[in-house]
Amino acid sequence: MLIEKIDYKFKEFNRVLQIEWTLGNTCNYNCSYCLPILHNNSFPWINLDESKTFIDKLHNHYSKLGITDYIWKFGGGEPTLYKDFVELCVYINSKPNNYIIPITNGSRKLHWWQEHAKNFFAVHFSIHPEFVDPNHIVAVCDNLIEQKIDSICHVMMKPNDWNRCLEIVEVLKNSQHKQWGIQAKPLHHTWELDTAEERDLYPYTAEQKQIFQAPIRAQNRISPRVDSKLNRDMYMVTEEGIKDFDPYWAVTHDIVDWSGFKCDAGINRIYINYDKRMYLGAGCRVELNNFVGKKYNEEFEFPTKSIICNQRRCVCIADVQVPKSR
């Protein structure tokens, strides 16, 4: 299939900047499919004051590019373990049109979520089969719905522990509230050098791949802050016409070569690593002078225009979700 373009169905989302920020690499899990550098506590948590300065600089730059709304996705490690996490969220929420989404394993006690969930627009749970207590996740997600906060669970599907993963899915489906979503997520092999060529999909069978074709349970958004400007549903333009585009479908079908495409990585999405270094997109490794690889507490320049992709493989779901055109 020849794809000419992928873009958001709702044009308002083109005026939204998505910031993925790894606050540190401290985690209370030690998953077999996760690189040690992502959970071994080898980098300190971010400095709160430096981060506030960066946040101000970011708003000033991107507002001049026509960005009106900002989605902050905080990961780790486990971001909720950061001692200043709540204060960081409060500072961001003091500015208009900011939406915070922790990417979390959900292991914090229920009372923590009951107290602090008011700071979040939504919560994305990474469900790790080797450590998760699925009944606890159900209790947390049900409570978030009662607080009118959207959530979705991404279940990491290990092909060699498939039955355990399916058992977890069944526990999640048996929740009191059905508005929060459940999505099976394909895993990629741990890579040594962080090059796109090494990010190969786990060896799923054709039957196993079927679970990635559609959400297990679609998310029914209930947050009063939700509107079309925050809907990132996508379409693609092909030789056969206009069709819906699902990034999970693209990755599982090895539609990962976007080289030569104009891509909005850096304009629509940026990533900040646990070492404070910034990148375009999320896992994107396209170079951009005076931005890519720079630390956010040093001198740098934010991107000002789309880039031309020169990578042969783009397998990070978040990067695939960035608009692209030939």
Predicted features along the sequence, with ranges:
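Flexible mid-to-C-terminal extensions adjoining Fe-S/redox cofactors in radical SAM and related proteins
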Residues: 1-17, 37, 41, 269, ...
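Short, hydrophobic/glycine-enriched beta-strand segments
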Residues: 17-23, 73-74
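N-terminal active-site segment of His-dependent metallophosphoesterases
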Residues: 34-59
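Radical SAM/AdoMet-radical enzyme domain recognition
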Residues: 52-73, 82-175, 179-183
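Acidic metal-phosphate-binding loop of nucleotide-sugar-dependent transferases
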Residues: 78-79
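Conserved C-terminal portion of the radical SAM core fold
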Residues: 132-248
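C-terminal accessory regions of radical SAM enzymes
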Residues: 224-288
